[in-house]
Every structure is written in C-alpha cells, then in structure tokens.
C-alpha cells in the first residue's frame, strides 16, 4: 500500500476528487530500456491486492475497494457460492469493529469516515460482494514514491485463485491523514486479522451443509415431492428481521407424514394439491413462508437450513391495481365486460384478475409449485 500512501500524502488537503488514487499513475522502471508511465489502481499489501474504483461520478470520496485474497492463505480450495457466502459473513465482524472505532455521533459519515459492506440475510446467493476469481500476482517491486521496478528474474508468476471481497469506504473530507490511516493501516490490518483467525472448522461445516442441501434438491427432482422441511427447523422469524425467533418451538413432522431424505428426517410435501389448515396463530403462514423461502439455500444458524423447495416454486398473491398485458386468464375467468379473457390487458387489475394473471404468468415461466396464502 506504499504507492497508495504516496498518492494520498501528495494530494491537496481539501481535495474532493482523489484523482491520483483512482488513476494509479506510476513510473515503471525496466532493467534494459527506458522507463514508462503506466496506470494501475491495484495496490498490494504483501500478496493481497486491493483494486480501487469509482463508486459514482459524484462520489469521489467514497471509493469501491475489491480485496483479492489467495485462497491458499485461508487453507481451502473449495470455490463455490457457499464458500464465498461463508467468507463474507466471517469478514463482516472485522469491518464492524473498525466502524465501532470510528463512530462519532456528532459528525456525519462524510466528515468522520465509515466502512460499508453488504450484510446478507439468511439466503446463500451468488453475490458480487464475495466471489472467487483468478487474479494476477504482483510482478513488480516498489521503489520510492510512485516508482516501481520490474524484476529481472524470469520467474513465472501464474494467476492465483482468490477470494474477492468488495466493499466501499467513505473517506473523511479534508482529513487526508485519517484517510491514509483508514486505507493503508486499519483496513489491511483487518484483512490480516480475518486471515489469521479464519475458522476452517466452521467453513467445512458450511460446505458440508451446502452439499447436503444439494443432495436433497437432487432427490426432490427425482421424487414425487416438491418440498421438504427437516425436523428441528426453526421456522418463525423475529419481528422486523430475517433472524430466527428466539424461543421458537422447533418444527416436528407428524408421524404419518414423516420420511427420511438423505439421512435427515422431516416432512415432505407431495406434488399435487396440498391444503394447510389450522386455527388462528397456529403457524399456517409461517410454514408456507418457510416453504417459499426454501427455493434458496440458507446459512448455518438461520433455522431453515434444511427447508428445501423445488427451485421453480412461485408465491401467488392478489395485486390490486397492477398492470396486466396480453395474458390468457380464461381458465379462471370466462367473461369480463369489454375484454377478451383469452388476451386480457388492463392498467388497473382487480384482485381476482391480478391473481389469475399471476398464476398464468408463473406457469408460463415454468413454475411448478404454486404457493397461495
């Protein structure tokens, strides 16, 4: 990060563009020919790279940083979306700790500085905030200032598979010393701490869970069932959050509906028409919500880790006032005044016509299970 520090130290204290940091202009010295000017906004902390890019043309003081950490430093070689998801969740506490040290309620973020990183819900998804990619290794030696030297050693430096974590940093206005501390000292130290304390045991548990989820999904595709809810799952969510409800009663299948799938016992829902009945506040909608959420895998601790649903499932609801264009709703509504239900269009659908359109659109898109509350 020496080159980045050089750029920041030589900026005007009242700068608002941070142009030098984004350009990465450096003087490249060759062993046997004249030096050249190159532009490289990738900065190195030992063998870990950090690429700095614009977040928005009107937000120069809020750069986007992409850290690339060789997976060999973390001790694994599994490069799946579940692996990236676990790494993102493991990295977040170190950013939260940095923000705790920066926090000053009397100043806004653009004066005080702040780190931003995506905080996912319980779903395990492919994200552009954490992914794996091949990255080039550092192929130069830092000199003074923005001068770099190409080594004359003919050593091959093939690209390495890296964990890439993307985040943003709000740099404090008019405080370049603090910006240097945030970018060149505190953030690299947090990355080092993340690597040093990486919990490979919990990582392996997350990978094992993702394999179990994939096995159950594969079983659903070949079976007469469209959803599975494992015994012991925590289905209710805490108010206003996606976290499991503290003190909730774990799900338990009825004996006559219980089956075993891939070594896990629970309740499976057959293809066909299934009606969930019960009194008020008995958990009907909670169960249906869990089935709906089962199109996604969930992380350890979410409570719905082994609630698995056919990925094509679609939740159907009435949407008063929505627009409908050229949808055949004749299977549900045979006649409407002033319109052909085989080619129905409106800018303001009623509850019944919007729900009929939702069903037909879902079927046209290939949805198999339809969930209606």
Language model feature labels by segment:
Residues 264-292, 296:
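Glycine-rich phosphate-binding P-loop
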Residues 297-311:
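Flexible phosphate/Mg2+-sensing switch loops adjacent to catalytic phosphate-binding sites
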Residues 162, 177-181, 238-242, 279-281, ...:
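Short acidic, glycine/serine/threonine-rich loops at helix termini
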Residues 1-224, 235:
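N-terminal accessory targeting/assembly segments
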Residues 245-267, 322-343:
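Active-site-adjacent "gating/activation" loops or surface patches in catalytic cores
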Residues 166, 227-229, 236, 258-260, ...:
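Structured core elements
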